[in-house]
Amino acid sequence: MARYTGPMWKISRRLGISLSGTGKELQKRPYPPGQHGPGQRRKLSEYGLQLQEKQKLRHMYGVNERQFRKTFEEAGKMPGKHGENFMILLESRLDNLVYRLGLARTRRQARQLVTHGHILVDGSRVNIPSYRVKPGQTIAVREKSRNLQVIKEALEANNYIPDYLTFNPEKMEGTYTRLPERSELPAEINEALIVEFYSR
């Protein structure tokens, strides 16, 4: 399955979460596309709830189904809780951490910055969005890319930097200091439903 590249507001409304991080797409019309007015949402089956939760997390991180499933299976081989490990692996993606550092307004924008070679990891250019950053590694904007308007606008937005990251705005450089705890990851996701979905 290919990665979805259409309007994110449609997906946000369908799943009932903000994928842009601003919440604007849910303010005006907080009901699914195609539904004329804020009527009652159709009650989902157990399978439907599990599928919806999987889609929420997959679209949140902008991962295609093949990568998503592969990461899920990898998380199952790690010690600890399967669902929690899965979310930590997704959070450790380079494109996500570029977004978390406030260098991009959205994960989609962060993915483009990585793909176009604007991001360094420990001083070396990495253009793979799914690259897994390890604790202690440094993420920085390439010197030639520091005047990019999209990066300047993102930094001006004063985004919240999670406690598992440190960031120096003058150097446009941050460090992934440690793995996040579950309480620091998206609260609107019930990862147990995703584990149930893939365990069927």
Curated annotation (Swiss-Prot):
Subunit architecture: Part of the 30S ribosomal subunit. Contacts protein S5. The interaction surface between S4 and S5 is involved in control of translational fidelity.
Cited SMART domains: Ribosomal_S4 (SM01390), S4 (SM00363)
Keywords: Ribonucleoprotein, Ribosomal protein, RNA-binding, rRNA-binding
Role: One of the primary rRNA binding proteins, it binds directly to 16S rRNA where it nucleates assembly of the body of the 30S subunit.
An individual GO BP term: translation
Membership in a protein family: Belongs to the universal ribosomal protein uS4 family.
Name listed for the protein in its UniProt record: Small ribosomal subunit protein uS4
GO MF entries: rRNA binding; structural constituent of ribosome
Start and end residues of each stretch annotated as Disordered: 22-42
Gene3D superfamilies for this protein: Ribosomal Protein S4 Delta 41, Chain A, domain 1 (1.10.1050.10), RNA-binding S4 domain (3.10.290.10)
Domain S4 RNA-binding: 92-152
GO CC list: small ribosomal subunit
